[in-house]
Swiss-Prot record:
Region (G4): 153-156
Keywords: Actin-binding, Cytoplasm, Elongation factor, GTP-binding, Hydrolase, Nucleotide-binding, Protein biosynthesis
Region (G1): 14-21
Enzyme class at the top of the EC tree: hydrolase
Function statement: Translation elongation factor that catalyzes the GTP-dependent binding of aminoacyl-tRNA (aa-tRNA) to the A-site of ribosomes during the elongation phase of protein synthesis. Base pairing between the mRNA codon and the aa-tRNA anticodon promotes GTP hydrolysis, releasing the aa-tRNA from EEF1A1 and allowing its accommodation into the ribosome. The growing protein chain is subsequently transferred from the P-site peptidyl tRNA to the A-site aa-tRNA, extending it by one amino acid through ribosome-catalyzed peptide bond formation.
Organism: Dictyostelium discoideum (Social amoeba)
PANTHER family xref list: TRANSLATION FACTOR (PTHR23115)
Sequence segments annotated as region (G2): 70-74
Protein name per its UniProtKB record: Elongation factor 1-alpha
Disulfide bridge map: none
Gene name, Swiss-Prot/TrEMBL: eef1a1
Amino acid sequence: MGKEKTHINIVVIGHVDAGKSTTTGHLIYKCGGIDKRVIEKYEKEASEMGKQSFKYAWVMDKLKAERERGITIDIALWKFETSKYYFTIIDAPGHRDFIKNMITGTSQADCAVLVIASPTGEFEAGIAKNGQTREHALLAYTLGVKQMIVAINKMDEKSTNYSQARYDEIVKEVSSFIKKIGYNPEKVAFVPISGWNGDNMLERSDKMEWYKGPTLLEALDAIVEPKRPHDKPLRIPLQDVYKIGGIGTVPVGRVETGIIKPGMVVTFAPAGLSTEVKSVEMHHEQLPEARPGDNVGFNVKNVSVKEIKRGMVAGDSKNDPPQETEKFVAQVIVLNHPGQIHAGYSPVLDCHTAHIACKFTEIVDKVDRRTGAVVAKEGTAAVVLKNGDAAMVELTPSRPMCVESFTEYPPLGRFAVRDMRQTVAVGVIKSTVKKAPGKAGDKKGAAAPSKKK
């Protein structure tokens, strides 16, 4: 056994008909962990339903259907590997809660693959001002996904017909809009592909001799290896807390930063409780330590299952322990709110595993959504927000909550604003004010029963 390959998370973004499912399905199909027998079974089903045209998309379709029904998916389906990395597709849009998943998602994407349709009309529609392409790319950038690959798809379509001129035109347009968002187009690979025929997916296409760049697989292999945050203090947002007979209380969550090991004293925020970790396990095996990305259960002493719950955060008592957040300032971008947002607005925030109503106590300033620079105020009226606006906002949680600034602990510093059953805005936390310990009501607030989602 050599050194294990590095794991890389990718998110696939782009307009609704750009061919994301076919392209992703193709990669998983060719380099992934899908059993050949399963593939044959799916192909047979697809052809019986007269859906051969869905060549690779059925892979993703099957996955989405299972996801929607809440079935735990055979995770191998979302994975594929290259000579250098193991890839996991952490989400693909088209899923109802894509935006929410991308923000509260269990993991940070290391790279975004933006799929663009090249045919006449399709490209223009996808990149239009109100198209999803821009919104997805802006979201990816705002949420800290700093590497991007652009796959220019459907090069085999009649209107495109593998044309270099069309490719050049698209590269120019896309470069200009991703540059406005904050990406550096010179560091982005633009790969002309056919997710359908496989041109430039794994092997070079003989139909585009003019193209000298990498195939999609080579571009994925050339991703810069991300630094994992194991040297930061420990943070584990709790997903669940179990009471296991003969063992006791076992909180479960994903290590986002730092390292947890038996014998360590951990603090749970916002409850303000500290206790010793007796053991750490993953997949029913005891571990000497767990690192970022690991989903673990850890057994704790003398804490009842009533005192800690989903949405709380565990950290090392001796190294910047997590604390209750009294209020915080965030840069918020409004995506789809039907009206105007005024100070006093109190939607639900999904931040890591917490799901808590927070009040927009003050809308401080509107800002440029790309640079973050303050936009000069007009007149003295209170600032009001509408779709497309970005602003610095001070928020106050309606009940005890623990969040962190995005620069210190990224997964605990980004959130989705939910209202009317949809994501109306996203935010990145710039600074937090911690509640002074020992204030009356600390314990009581923490033990209040949580409303289930």
